[in-house]
């Protein structure tokens, strides 16, 4: 689960990631998160789906839930195609995509781009804040580990961001407070 703050309102948004089966879609349709993520064509993840599989899964998704494609060093053409054909509402770049990749992608689509950053030290957050992506995602690193990073490193952030990694019932309240103190 990921928590996101959006500078346009004071509400907390929820994103559930790693959907790959029809049962997952039925569960998120019932839970009604704001976003759901699909790890696309990243074979080293057991949660990975193909482009064709994500197209089929999204057909069953509640239209109020925005589908996010999670890409790790994917060819730009794959990202563009799934954004342009309406399969995805947002792209999350979770690999080594640099600023030139993000800027070029943004010239081809008006869909929103999320760039994930692994946070180990305060300077990692400063680097994230310089990103031209529409949203930044602050994570412990690697994705899907269930671990948090040191949230005390997060300053007041005046732009939309996702907080990811290890968010559960024991720390959800703290995650929400971090978002309220920022945006």
PLM features: residue spans?
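Conserved N-terminal beta1-alpha1 strand-loop-helix module at the mouth
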Residues: 1-182
């Amino acid at each position: 689960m990921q928590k996101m703050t959006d500078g346009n309102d004071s509400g907390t948004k929820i994103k559930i990631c790693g959907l790959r089966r029809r049962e997952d879609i039925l569960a998120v349709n019932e839970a009604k998160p704001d976003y759901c993520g699909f790890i696309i064509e990243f074979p080293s993840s057991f949660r990975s789906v193909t482009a064709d599989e994500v197209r089929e899964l999204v057909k069953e998704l509640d239209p109020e839930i925005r589908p996010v494609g999670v890409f790790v060093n994917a060819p730009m053409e794959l990202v563009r195609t799934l954004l342009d054909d309406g399969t995805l509402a947002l792209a999350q770049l979770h690999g080594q995509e640099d600023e030139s990749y993000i800027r070029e992608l943004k010239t081809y689509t008006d869909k929103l781009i999320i760039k994930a950053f692994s946070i180990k030290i305060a300077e990692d957050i400063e680097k994230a804040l310089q990103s031209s992506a529409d949203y930044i995602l602050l994570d412990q690193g690697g994705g899907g580990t269930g671990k948090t990073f040191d949230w005390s490193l997060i300053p007041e952030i005046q732009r939309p961001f996702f907080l990811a990694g290890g968010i559960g019932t024991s720390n959800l309240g703290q995650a929400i407070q971090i978002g309220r103190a920022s945006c």
